[in-house]
Amino acid sequence: MKKSKKTLRQIIALMAIAFTTISLTACGGSDDDGDKDDLITASEYLPGKEWTIGNETYSFYKNHLLVCESSANVTTGGLTSQAYLYFGTWQLDGNRLTAAITSSTQPNFDASKFFHGTYSNVHTEKDTSGGTISSDKPGSITITEPKPYIVGTGTDGKSCYIYYHKNMTEDKTDETIHDRALHGTWYNKVQLTDTKNGTMKTYEAKMIFNADGTVQFVIGDVIDFTTTYETKNGTVTLGSYILKDNPASFIYLQYGPVVSLYDVSQTRYTCDRWYNTPQ
């Protein structure tokens, strides 16, 4: 029994040392200009991550697309409300951040309720909260140091705090006019009307994005043409889509094996999903 008490005291002592160490690490250089220089800049830190602003979490894609996703909620009657996506753009010019949510899969949404505006003096600051200590198994202690957060000043003079949520490992986008996230061959099923007898027929469709700014559509043995595309701020503009002489623009999201193309208006939206393997 005495041995058990001694072991417990040792564990408590180790945890106390760990807490002391992380506290000193977090606070030791808070007034030291040299320590501030070690912080990553906001322009390097912001892209490709999810950030919490107020009560919402936003995805800051590397191609400057800004996305917020609402959660599906269970209502009083036991029904599940629909989850919505909110799309916009973000730009960081020097230390000035501009952001706005401009469209959504929710009809007639209120854009003013979401993160928007221009913020100056945007910079990172070190979180001095002390981090967390956890133990997954006896004798094992994990120390998690806090991530720096981002601060900016709005046009009203108030500070805006942007807190790190998680890294977006699935973000393969870039800010070029031929975003690499789209590159490759994508498959779908497409229904076309047979001009001979007026019946609908389902075909396997291929959409092939090339790095040179061309995209080829191949649908069964009835359609095969090549057109051009350009990307900007998470929107792709196509010279034609599926059919010739059918120009189109979409907000695009690429998650692993799927590319989702959203056509969003004020009152409705459509979403075409293309896959990296035949369906």
Question: What positions do the PLM features span?
Answer:
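C-terminal motif of bacterial Sec signal peptides marking the signal peptidase cleavage site
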Residues: I22-A26
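Bacterial N-terminal signal peptides that target proteins for export
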Residues: K2-A13
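Hydrophobic helical h-region of N-terminal Sec-dependent signal peptides
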Residues: A13-T21
